[in-house]
Amino acid sequence: MEIDCMKTRDIIHNDKILARYIPATEAWGSSDLSFFSQDEEYIQAGSWNYNKGKKLLAHTHNEVERSVLFTQEVIYVKSGSLQAYIYDDNSILVEEITAYADDVLIMLSGGHGYEILEDNTKVLEIKNGPYLGAEIDRDRLNLDG
């Protein structure tokens, strides 16, 4: 099923959030600070939209031990477009999403893959760490069986 929507929405399968799609109009349309992640999610993603002169209070982040069981990632499409394929934990395709310039995708669980739709598509990918290497951090989906 391919969805091409203009509102932030969760891709849910069997009561589990697999991904979150934030179109450009919502990612960058609000004023102030807007977070798209839930507090309990391993990765936190939000956007700023402030006017000149806004000052953000200087701060540090406290050392806090956290238990992180999965790698989650955020994809920001800077330019071009891509097709995102969202899979459940059993490698079953649940949904396809077309993402365009300035759209954001948060991959929370299950599997995913991408197809670049335009030349010179530029994407910023952000993941939680530490990175333990491809052999430990990920499994390739067997989509033939």
Regions found by a protein language model. Give the residues of each.
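Short acidic-glycine-tyrosine-enriched beta hairpin
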Residues: 88-109
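Double-stranded beta-helix
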Residues: 113-145
